[in-house]
């Protein structure tokens, strides 16, 4: 059993909604400093224009810099400033999609908190009830924000192999899945029961 859970990921991301955050390509929820800005600008000059650097400089000392996949990795790395960094989890959005063995198209999104939402070049975390938390830059905000899944452009959902999705969450089988044809009413783990997709 993994020490990291889908429930824990959602709790961490919900906490991040209350922090002062700003989007920084390649960031891992680290305190914004001039050295951090300079380092990331050298790594990814395409994403650090002069105007963007000036914006980031106004956040020095008061904000945490992160990107979408960095927010997931910061949970695995022990939280703010990543005190428990491990290279085996240091991957990009496509890497997370590729390593997942359990995934599907967004139309089949199960009602399971902690699933990763994916579109090319971007990820978020499903928190239930048709909502997502993501770290983004653009019309949806700058930093960690909560958004609606519908109409956002997500193409797939997936489970990360490093997270335990068996958080003891159970549901009573009563939908129109095949097992209900036998009048099954036993509590079942949400990962083993068909659930209706989010509209």
Whereabouts are the PLM-identified features?
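Surface-exposed intrinsically disordered loops and tails
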Residues: 34-58, 83, 87-106, 147, ...
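Loop/turn positions that initiate beta-strands
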Residues: 112-115
């Amino acid at each position: 059993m993994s020490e990291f859970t889908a429930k824990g990921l959602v709790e961490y991301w919900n906490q991040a909604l209350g922090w002062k955050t700003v989007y920084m390509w390649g960031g891992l929820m680290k305190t914004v400093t001039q050295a951090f800005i300079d380092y990331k600008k050298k790594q990814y000059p395409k994403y650090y224009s002069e105007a963007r650097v000036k914006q980031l400089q106004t956040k020095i000392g008061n904000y945490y810099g992160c990107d979408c996949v960095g927010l997931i990795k910061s949970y695995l790395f022990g939280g703010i400033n990543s005190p428990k960094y491990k290279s085996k989890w240091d991957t990009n959005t496509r890497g997370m999609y590729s390593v997942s063995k359990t995934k599907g198209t967004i139309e089949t999104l199960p009602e399971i908190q902690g699933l990763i939402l994916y579109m090319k070049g971007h990820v978020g975390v499903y928190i239930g009830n048709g909502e997502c938390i993501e770290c983004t830059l653009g019309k949806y905000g700058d930093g960690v924000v909560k958004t609606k899944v519908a109409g956002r452009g997500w193409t797939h959902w997936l489970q990360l192999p490093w997270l335990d999705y068996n958080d003891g969450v159970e549901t009573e089988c009563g939908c129109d899945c095949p097992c209900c044809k036998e009048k099954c009413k036993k509590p079942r783990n949400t990962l083993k029961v068909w659930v209706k997709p989010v509209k």
